[in-house]
């Protein structure tokens, strides 16, 4: 296979990111949920947990709910209560999640440069 395909270089670098000890290993569902959440965060939108659970409709609600908890346990997200209504919870990125996406971005740029 050709070695000069930027996307394949990026995938190779992204796989290396998964093996770094400073970032937790994410399975496909966790990664998908985190990526779906990141789109809302990029748009500076508050993401309610119920909205986060709407991502990946092919996955059961129970699985997505447990994966949100796992992402929190892994330090990639945190859940914060609304300041006016404690029943409403928001999914927010942690510093680790922001560093994860920053590193992925650097790898994307690097894959295009070589």
Predicted regions and their residues:
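General nucleic-acid-binding
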Residues: 1-4
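Short alpha-helical segments that sit at the start of domains
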Residues: 7-36
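Amphipathic alpha-helical dimerization/coiled-coil segments
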Residues: 9, 17-18, 102-114
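Short helix-to-turn junction characteristic of helix-turn-helix DNA-binding domains
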Residues: 37-41
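A short, conserved structural fragment
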Residues: 72-82
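Short, cationic-aromatic polyanion-contact patches
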Residues: 82-105
């Amino acid at each position: 296979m050709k070695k000069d395909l930027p996307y394949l270089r990026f995938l190779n670098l992204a796989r290396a990111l998964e093996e770094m000890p400073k970032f937790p290993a994410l399975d496909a569902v966790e990664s998908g949920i985190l990526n779906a959440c990141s789109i809302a965060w990029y748009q500076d939108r508050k993401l309610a947990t119920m909205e986060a659970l709407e991502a990946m409709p092919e996955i059961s609600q129970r699985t997505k709910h447990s994966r949100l908890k796992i992402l929190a346990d892994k330090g990639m997200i945190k859940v914060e209560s609304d300041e006016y209504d404690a029943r409403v919870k928001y999914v927010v990125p942690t510093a680790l999640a922001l560093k994860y996406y920053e590193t992925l971005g650097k790898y994307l740029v690097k894959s295009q440069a070589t």
